[in-house]
Amino acid sequence: MACITSFVTTFGQRAFRRPLTTDEITRYSAVAAQAAKDTNDVWQGLEAIASAFLQSPHFLYLTEVGAPDPQNTARYRYTAYEMASRLSYFLTNDTPDDALIAAAASGALLTPAGVEA
């Protein structure tokens, strides 16, 4: 079960371009565990999860909902992970690499100076 949870966490972050919530990790891990149990093959469980991730709207669409701006709650601004996705697709036409994900996780992409770096 630990390897399934590790796969869900790692693959899910790459597929969704953001960290998964605890609820998402629990749901996807349960689906993988059930598929592995039903087929008696852990690889079938991982295949079911990969298929579920690749069919999710979070993978298929680039969502930019944003979060309330702390200085002006009537406005919204991109979250750090949304900014990482926006930059990566603009510059490389691909998902964020490890450096952009790390910058998003540290909060560096929430400032103009961090985006320019």
What is each stretch, according to the model?
Residues 1-117:
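Composition-driven recognition of low-complexity segments enriched
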